[in-house]
């Protein structure tokens, strides 16, 4: 399929996607019933969309195009109410978190969807292993060249986004020792990590043509980069965050990305170059492994900075943009989180350290999501 022209969209508008876990009490393992829930709610959703993701234990909540985080929060709140009622009617529960702490990937059923079935054919068991749960945020751009500039700018802050959203310390019944283990699942994919370097939209079109020669890439949706342009929406899509445990934290993360995008495209503070990416995977690993306690390294100077310190610096820089975007409350909440030194991964570990079981942890996550 040829790459579509870049659709011009209103700059800095938002679209947010949350991949939720469908679980089956009292054992709180993943259920295989997302299709049933989608059928139950399809006539009840008035704004946004509830739809499939890769496997039948995943339920995606997606907003329409939103001006700001308050509009997005309202759409999510309405969808959440409908989905929770449908889940209760079918004796199911819903929760966030980047991974289910003890599910077995072999049990996961890939959705009966042409694209997902084709992906299963291409990638085999890797697709079942990709039963993990992330938050994706789209930001509107006025042109393809703006999208490429924004993608490179946001890529500088991938460690910050990962650390602030980290919520996947447990996988397959084991403490992984990572704050965010979810991104590791995609490490075997040939398109894992950052997008290959291009400096403008024309070069991106040439890159996509080259990738399509592999016959594994039919559309942008087949690319698993950390951040990717979405020409059919006219957006840049950030894909590195774990799904938070609460709707409020998900909205705050979207506000962070919107405000950062506004700062980047308004101030143009960086002259991007390929060397920017030399230590990308090392810095990304630090955030996944240690969360806010990680250390990032500047590929140009060799300077090493605590991620906590650098995140506070980012929040300060984007505060005026956050005010203009109506996202100041999000930046203030994230500032409090950084100062406290906590993320959701640590809260999960604290629950288990206090004697809680992994079953109890999922139950707690369902209560948190329903109560937010």
From Swiss-Prot:
One of its GO terms (biological process) is modified amino acid biosynthetic process. The keyword Oxidoreductase does not apply. InterPro entries: GCL_type2/YbdK_subfam, GCS2, Gln_synth/guanido_kin_cat_dom, YbdK. HAMAP family: Glu_cys_ligase_2. It catalyses: L-cysteine + L-glutamate + ATP = gamma-L-glutamyl-L-cysteine + ADP + phosphate + H(+). Signal peptide: none annotated. Belongs to the glutamate--cysteine ligase type 2 family. YbdK subfamily. Keywords: ATP-binding, Ligase, Nucleotide-binding. The lineage of its organism: Bacteria, Pseudomonadati, Pseudomonadota, Gammaproteobacteria, Enterobacterales. Its EC number is 6.3.2.2. The keyword Cell cycle does not apply. ATP-dependent carboxylate-amine ligase which exhibits weak glutamate--cysteine ligase activity. Pfam families: GCS2 (PF04107). The gene is ybdK. Homodimer. SUPFAM superfamilies: Glutamine synthetase/guanido kinase. This is Putative glutamate--cysteine ligase 2. GO terms for molecular function: ATP binding; glutamate-cysteine ligase activity.
């Amino acid at each position: 399929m040829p790459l579509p022209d870049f659709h011009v969209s209103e700059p800095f508008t938002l679209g947010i996607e949350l991949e939720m876990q469908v679980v089956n009490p009292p054992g709180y393992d993943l259920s295989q019933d997302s299709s049933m829930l989608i059928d139950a709610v399809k006539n009840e959703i008035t704004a946004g969309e509830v739809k499939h993701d890769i496997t039948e234990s995943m339920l995606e909540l997606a907003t329409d195009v939103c001006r700001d985080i308050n509009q997005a929060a309202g759409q999510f709140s309405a969808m959440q109410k409908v989905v929770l009622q449908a889940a209760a009617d079918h004796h199911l529960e819903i929760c966030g978190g980047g991974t289910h702490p003890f599910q077995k990937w072999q049990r996961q059923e890939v959705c009966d969807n042409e694209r997902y079935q084709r992906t299963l054919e291409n990638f085999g068991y890797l697709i079942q292993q990709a039963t993990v749960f992330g938050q994706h945020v789209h930001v509107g751009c006025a042109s393809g060249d703006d999208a490429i500039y924004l993608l490179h700018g946001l890529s500088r802050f991938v460690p910050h986004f990962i650390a602030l959203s980290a919520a996947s310390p447990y996988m397959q019944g084991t403490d992984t020792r990572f704050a965010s283990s979810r991104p590791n699942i995609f490490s075997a994919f040939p398109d894992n990590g950052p997008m290959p370097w291009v400096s403008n939209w024309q070069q991106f079109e040439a890159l996509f043509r080259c990738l399509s020669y592999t016959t594994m890439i039919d559309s942008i949706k087949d690319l698993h980069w950390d951040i990717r342009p979405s020409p059919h929406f006219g957006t840049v899509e950030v894909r590195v965050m774990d799904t938070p445990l609460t709707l409020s934290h998900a909205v705050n993360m979207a506000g962070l990305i919107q405000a950062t995008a506004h700062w980047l495209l308004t101030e143009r503070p960086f002259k991007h170059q390929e060397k920017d990416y030399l230590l990308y995977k090392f810095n990304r690993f630090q955030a996944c492994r240690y969360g806010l306690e990680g250390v990032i390294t500047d590929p140009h100077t060799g300077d090493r900075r605590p991620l906590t310190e650098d995140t506070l610096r980012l929040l300060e820089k984007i505060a005026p943009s956050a005010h203009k975007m109506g996202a100041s409350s999000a930046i203030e909440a994230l500032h409090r989180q950084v100062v406290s030194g906590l993320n959701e991964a640590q809260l999960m570990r604290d629950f288990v350290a206090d004697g809680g079981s992994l079953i109890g942890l999922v139950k707690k996550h369902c209560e948190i999501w329903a109560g937010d």
